[in-house]
Amino acid sequence: MNYDKIKRSGILFLLGIGAITSLSCNDNDNGGYPERVPTRLSVMPLPERVDYKESVVTLPQNVTVSQNIPVSTSQLLKSTLEEKLSLSASDASNDHAFIQVQQESDLAKEAYRLTVTKEGACIYYSTETGLLWGIQTLRQALEQANFFTSGNSKYLPMVDIKDAPKYDWRGFHIDVVRHMFTVDYLKKVIDCLSFYKINKLHLHLTDDQGWRIEVKK
């Protein structure tokens, strides 16, 4: 099992679907922007509701991220912006950030809402888990923006996404009894699972009373 292959396959699948839906639209369908500008997004798992506004927003060269986002979660966004899109990312007050957040107590525990308008993106959430899932959806959208470019510009479709997991338990199983994996590898797998909103990792540790250890000689 190879973590990079897992994530690369997922991203290529998303981009392939996005390319098919986007390139099927002509200039008249997307407001005169180049054909490769995305008018649709491919998100895994499929959100409950996606409403497109039939327009796009240009990503700024310096994307400001709300200071209200927890540091570890904010770093996920910044790594995508800097490493995947070659854009700079910096912190800003929530009211002045391109990527904003808004806590709403009436949303379910893991629910979120993501809106993309001409002013930027905003994630609505009630818990940090819901915020994380909203961030992961935005990261998937941003990675597709890297594929759809015109000159030096990168675009996101204006959209309103409302989503909540259908199942509380969304698991992934790894058999570490018969196969040896490093701790670093398992951490990468966890990052990949989070990217696709999988919230349980089942480590199959032993088949009997003994604990196996790797013997290389």
Q: In which residue ranges do the predicted regions lie?
A:
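Aromatic- and acidic-residue-enriched carbohydrate-binding clefts of CAZyme catalytic domains
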Residues: 165, 209-217
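Catalytic domains of carbohydrate-active enzymes, especially glycoside hydrolases
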Residues: 185-208
